[in-house]
Amino acid sequence: MQFRPFVYDAMNRQVPVTIEPMTPQDAALTDREPLWQTSWTSEYLANEDYEKYAAKVGDELIALAAYEVLPTALVVHIVYMEAQPESNPTLDGGTPKYRGIGRLLIAYGIKLSIDSGLTG
């Protein structure tokens, strides 16, 4: 089975997404306008035990997620996930640029669990 991540745009079309390890530049974008709910440069999210990933449509950062692989518990813990302000239900005024970001990040957590030899 192949993992083909996507979200839906405002016209309800599937848009392919790439998911890669978060870079310091990705984290810094959360401190610029339009501000994200959370600064991903914060001490809490800087925890080295967390695997952090960036979801992008082309070069556009649409979401960030932090996961904690807990092999002794046989799970991947989703520590935190957040959509860009334009697609964040608490910030977008009811008209998100992209939909399905939460489901995408949960699905990626399941993939990360399977890839880590856990049970998904």
Residue ranges and their predicted role:
Residues M1-K97, L104, Y108-G120:
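Non-catalytic substrate-recognition and accessory regions of acyl/acetyltransferase enzymes
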